[in-house]
Each structure stands twice: as C-alpha cells, then as structure tokens.
A protein has these predicted regions:
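Transmembrane alpha-helical segments that form core, pore/gating elements
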Residues: 60-63, 120-122, 126, 157-212, ...
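Cytoplasmic-side transmembrane-helix entry/capping segments in multi-pass membrane proteins
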Residues: 25, 77-87, 132-143, 163-164, ...
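Juxtamembrane helix-entry segments on the extracytoplasmic side of multipass membrane proteins
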Residues: 17-22, 45-49, 53, 74-80, ...
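Helix-helix packing/entry segments at the starts of transmembrane helices
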Residues: 52-54, 90, 94, 108-115, ...
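Hydrophobic transmembrane alpha-helices of multi-pass small-molecule transport proteins
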Residues: 57, 63, 83, 123, ...
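Hydrophobic/aromatic residues within transmembrane alpha-helices
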Residues: 42, 51, 55, 100, ...
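Glycine-/small-residue-enriched transmembrane alpha-helix faces in small-molecule transporters
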Residues: 2-50, 99, 156-183, 301
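Specific transmembrane alpha-helical segments of multi-pass solute transporters/efflux pumps
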Residues: 31-39, 64-113, 149, 230-248
Length: 301
C-alpha cells in the first residue's frame, strides 16, 4: 500500500472522475460484498462483540502507519470528535450486522445494508441542507427496485426478521455517520482519519469485547475470515471510502451500498456455488444502472 495519502478536500470534478469514481465504487462494493460472507463464517465462533473488536483492531493495525505520519494534526478535541463518529459509524453498525450474521444468511445483511443510501440522502437533506435532484431520485429508485428483486426469495428462515431489523438500524447509523465524516473530518488525511476511527472504536468496545470473549478456542477458518474482514474489508476499504466521501460527497458515495448485495450474490456463487438466476441478472442490471445514474452530474455542473 502506498504511503502517499491524499488529504481529504472539497469535491472536485474532471474528466478522469467519470471513470475513476465508478471504478472505485465497484471495487469498494466488491470488497464489502465479501464482508458479509466473512461475518457469517466467523460470527458463530467469535460472537458479535469479539468479532467486531477483532475487525476494528486488525483494520487499525493496517492503517496505523498513516496515522503516525499525521499525528501532529490530531488534537485531543479532534480525537473526541472521532470517537463519537466511530461509535455511530463503526462500533454500533458493525455489532448489529455481526449479531444478525449469527441468525440469518449473509445475504440478508448485505441487502439491508443497501438502505444506507436512502438514509444517507435523508440525513443530508434534512440535517445538512443538501439537495436531491430528480435524476438522482430516479437512479436511487432503480437501485432500490434492484435490491428488492435480490431480496425476493431470501426472506424466509429462522432469525431473518431479527437480522433485517438489525441491518436496518445499522443502516440508519451509517446514514448519520457518513454525513458526520463529511461534515467534521474534511481537511485531514483520509487514511489517518480511517485509522483514528478504527482505533477509537476498538478502544470504546474493548471492555465489552473482553468480557464476552469466547472461552473455547476459535478455529482457523474463523480467524482467517476475521483477518480478511479487518485488514481488507475494514482497513483498506475505509481509506477508499473516506476518499470517495471527500471527493464526491456523502450521499453519492453511499450508493456503493447498492452494489454490496449484488457482489454478495456473486461471491456466494463463486465461493459456495449458489446458483445465479434471471431475476438476479435483472436485479444486477437495475442496480448498476441506478448507481450510474445517481453518479451523473446535471449538465453544466
């Protein structure tokens, strides 16, 4: 990973962004699509809070060198601000999704996570005064329909509604957290901000995680999943996500959550052999079209 980190700055437009943003959103969706599979594997052995602690700590370990380079910028006031945002944007939603992963298939968490887009736009509109254009509303609606098609046929089984409610609550947290990152952490190196967020979250959760840590040994497959969940799906992904928030804004960056269920289905097909259907193909087309439309700027902007 390069140590040349671009500071968070105001969003900018240019010809390169036409390709850069969709590619980065797709990469991030692919990474986060795998996170629910890893949680499904690891959560039964770790338990929700210990798994989240491992995820936060491992992600922080990957990013700490970036924070060390920028440590002079991180005052005590900034650390308090980051701790509050970390609770809303990491600790609580991670714990809710991990709790749900113990009770339902991985796809349920990935599908409910797609509601982050809706909540992010609503928070931005009602609390931060950001406009929602008709073009983006159409794109959001198309993506939402695609997610609904993916969800069809996946809503039965023990614990599904519990997992769905937990995922919805987590998405509300993300909606606020994403906007708070954009509002209060602009101007700092993105990788350093991501590292500080994960460190603060790990410190906040440590007492509860230690108290609930499993007494029995955790098997190797669960540890492998936890390492990938922390280092790749949290550490590396947070850097990319914070850079997107800085460049294109919180609501547009949050549309990546429409891609997560799509990639969750693809990874399930590749890794555990779940079948692909025509409805999934239709859903994928709607999701991709919706995300693309929501990213387009109005003429003259």
């Amino acid at each position: 990973m390069s140590t040349d980190v671009t500071p968070i700055a105001a969003p900018g437009a240019g010809a390169a962004e036409r390709w850069r943003t969709p590619l980065e959103l797709t990469l991030l969706g692919a990474i986060w699509g795998g996170s629910f599979l890893f949680m499904r594997i690891a959560a039964p052995d770790f338990g929700p809070l210990p798994l989240v602690e491992a995820r936060l700590a491992l992600g922080a370990l990957v990013l700490t060198p970036f924070l060390w380079r920028a440590r002079a910028q991180f005052t005590s006031v900034l650390w308090l601000r980051i701790a509050g945002i970390a609770a809303i944007n990491s600790v609580i939603p991670f714990a809710l999704f991990a709790w749900g992963a113990e009770r339902a298939p991985a796809g349920i968490g990935a599908i409910t996570n797609a509601m982050t887009v809706m909540f992010t736009y609503l928070v931005a509109f009602f609390f931060f005064g950001e406009r929602i254009t008709a073009r983006r509303l159409i794109g959001l609606a198309g993506g939402f329909v695609g997610v609904a098609i993916l969800a069809s046929g996946r809503t039965t089984g023990d614990g599904v509604w519990q997992a769905a409610l937990a995922g919805t609550a987590a998405s509300v947290c993300y909606g606020f957290g994403i906007n708070l990152v954009r509002r209060y952490l602009t101007g700092y190196p993105s990788a350093a901000v991501a590292a500080a967020n994960l460190i603060a979250g790990a410190v906040l959760l440590a007492p509860l995680a230690a108290y609930t840590w499993p007494a029995r040994p955790i098997p190797a497959p669960s540890w492998t999943s936890a390492v990938l969940l922390g280092a790749l799906c949290t550490g590396a992904a947070f850097v990319l996500y914070y850079r997107l928030i800085a460049r294109i804004g919180a609501p547009r960056a949050s549309t990546v959550t429409y891609l997560i269920p799509l990639f969750g289905v693809v990874w399930a097909w590749l890794v555990i052999g779940e079948p692909l259907t025509m409805s999934m193909a239709l859903a994928g087309a709607l999701i991709l079209s919706g995300v693309a439309l929501s990213q387009q700027r109005a003429p003259g902007k």
